[in-house]
Amino acid sequence: MDFLSILPPQRHCTSELCDNDESVQAIISALEYTGLAKILTETFSADEFVEALDARLLYIAHIILSCKETNVPINTDTFLCPLAERIKVDVDDLNAGSLKCMKVLLHHCTNRYFIKIVEKMTRGQSSNLLWFLVRNELVTGSSVVKQCSYKPGLNSVAHGIFRPASRFEVFGKVHEPIVRDVIATFVERRPIPVSETLGLLIDPFSGTFGASIDLCYGIEEHDDGFVTVGERAHVYEIKCMARYIYSAADVEGFLDNPTLKGFASLIKGATFPLIEHRLPGATPSSGAHIVSHDRMFETNRKRKSIYESNDYVRRLLNINRGVKSTVYIFREKPQPDERDKLTLECLAKFTANIFLNARHKYFDQTSMQYFVVTQHYINDHPDPECIEPDTLPRVSVVTALFKTRNIGTHHSLEVNHKTYPNSAIPFALIVTPVAFDAEILSVFLRETFDNYAQQVYNKSKIRLWDPNFLRGFVASHRELEKTP
């Protein structure tokens, strides 16, 4: 079965609200007419210095007020009621002209509370219209490229929402929930902390950087619906490899006797192997997201031997070269006492020298996730100055490989008590921990912030600033001094 051909076409935003084109188009038109620069220009004087977090909250307030005024069916009161309480006005009196009233909130550390509200309101990510709107003009993993460089979004908000999703994106959206449940069942062996996909996480100190997380353990959802990041949180970035869907016949022999050597042979059999082999000290290409020095993954294909890389990339490659990934191998089997359902069993688990390629765009994405989640951990910690480096968040990339179903098998797949009809079958997960360098990441983030602030100034003549947003991040990576 060709799963890519039978998946129904989708728009990039799968929210049912997008079917109400008149309402959605109204809010999109309002945002594209104004934008962050125009909001700042109308609120502040030329050359005035504005903290980046304050600027972000003004823009988010504008977005949510625009949703209210254009009757987009979003519960805007979740954000507007606490906002009205803070600036001492009636929530029904809040409108686009109220933004200047928000100047009384400038420089308030309690403004970080609104960042938590945004996360709660944007759960579901691409199935949530507000996630697209609030994400606009944020620095995210998709707007950074090639380490220490930044490019603003070139496409309009409307393009991001209404563009057709590629068949690979659709495959990922359909199968990512399955992988989350596989991780919960076989890797973490505990329930998923937040039932819905986490919403947009915005850096609570700068308000400039954002990240969307596929799955995170070590967070806690409280009675008010807000989440806090605890010690040793573990972020899983899921990659469903739609380009590598194996037929059931191709993997049957391997699943009968799963070994690391057999897995390597399966990987090498692809026209463009998923895992790129490189000798120690050699620089990988930017095409494959995972690399190995193990000769088990070596192919006879000729590869370019020299690739350009800067000192930062070489340092990142060096600290990741020794990383060991864990490979899980699965096979479907009939669900006991339920003949019309399939479940998964773990056939084997082994470790291998497979690490994330610092030249690949996924490294930029995971770096942003690591930074933003760490900032939330610092913000949520009762005593940030006492944070130990070994309590900081971790990030792993989960590469999921799928196979077609056996001929004649049409039963639903059940994983973690959830049912998935007509899906491909996950038969391998490669869980790859990622190592980061706080010094390199801090340099990149500072350069990115300055670049972003300059672009905002060019459009608005307002100077965004935040000289200290990296202070806690840098300090948290230093070992605490031992007291006698």
Swiss-Prot record:
- Spell out the molecular function terms from Gene Ontology: DNA binding; endonuclease activity; exonuclease activity
* Residues the record marks as site: Required for function: 176, 214, 237, 239
Tell me yes or no: is Hydrolase among this UniProt entry's keywords: yes
Recite the UniProt keywords alphabetically. Answer: Endonuclease, Exonuclease, Host cytoplasm, Host nucleus, Host-virus interaction, Hydrolase, Nuclease
Residues annotated as coiled-coil are none
**Record's keyword annotation contains Hydrolase:** yes
| Bilayer-crossing regions | none
Pfam families, per database record: Viral_alk_exo (PF01771)
Please give the subunit comment from the record.
Interacts with major DNA-binding protein; this interaction increases the nuclease processivity of the alkaline exonuclease.
* Record-given protein name: Alkaline nuclease
